[in-house]
Amino acid sequence: PSDRYNETTDSIMAILENGISIPEKMDDPVKFSEAIFSQCNNMKSLEVAFSMAILDLWCQQNHISLHEYFDADPKSAPKTSYTISIGDMDLIGEKVAEGFPYSILKVKLGMGIKKDKEIVKAIRSFTDKIIRVDANEGWDLETGIEMCKWLKEQGVEFVEQPFKSTNLKDTAELRKKSPLPLIADENSLTSSDIPEIDGVFDGINIKLM
């Protein structure tokens, strides 16, 4: 559940406990999904959970892979990243190892310049892979300017959501001074948000929910 979408665990559980009517047959996964989504009270995380389960079941029943269902070529697909969750600094090496199959790593920062640099340096001590950074709305303008310049030197590809979603003024200012592209996350909840952030960010993080 996401607070950004006004969802809570309790609100999700209330819908599930009230009961979801499942169609008897799944001749079409899209129509099957729509029948279930109509009962989800617009709770996007719940819709995504059902969508994943439905597509997985459909592909297994029809003995095809997910990329075959979407008629997609894995070889030409954009490269995705593996997110490293930083808790214990002593476990960074283990976290980096977990992301071995991925060519790109993503790390959440926004804990202050000193801590953020410490985390990136630690990751760099284990790998030279491309890193993507999510500042998680944790910086101010001065920090953003310093960090973006420093992160460029560390082989970082882009910075996601450097400031609070309400702080578009500083985001626009940082974009002028940052050597790295800025990607919107909390500022792009739905497609209707895009006109407001056009020219402020270089791209958006599209959530499949």
Model-predicted regions and their roles:
Residues V107-M209:
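Catalytic core of soluble alpha/beta enzymes
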Residues P1-I131, G138, E142-I145, K149-E153:
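N-terminal capping/lid subdomain adjacent to the active-site entrance of alpha/beta enzymes
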